[in-house]
Amino acid sequence: MNHLIVTVGDSFSGRKFDLEVPKDVESEKLLDDILETLRGYAPELQWRISEVALWDRRLGRMLKPGETLEEAGVWNGDTLYLAQK
């Protein structure tokens, strides 16, 4: 399986979205894609990639720039939060 289903939460508004994401894309590219997708669901969420990072609840850490979900150890069903850098 080349994709994971993750819940992406906006830690500021409390909203959550389930998304299917590729596990082999670097976290910064994935974050940019997630922000673009969330703007379609919730236009009021106007986060810039320079302001936020992806934080994995189960792992208890931010994903590193250049790290893929697979390299980070993100599992299917994990919750990723948009967290302020």
Question: Where are these predicted regions, by residue range?
Answer:
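Ubiquitin system architectures
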Residues: 1-85
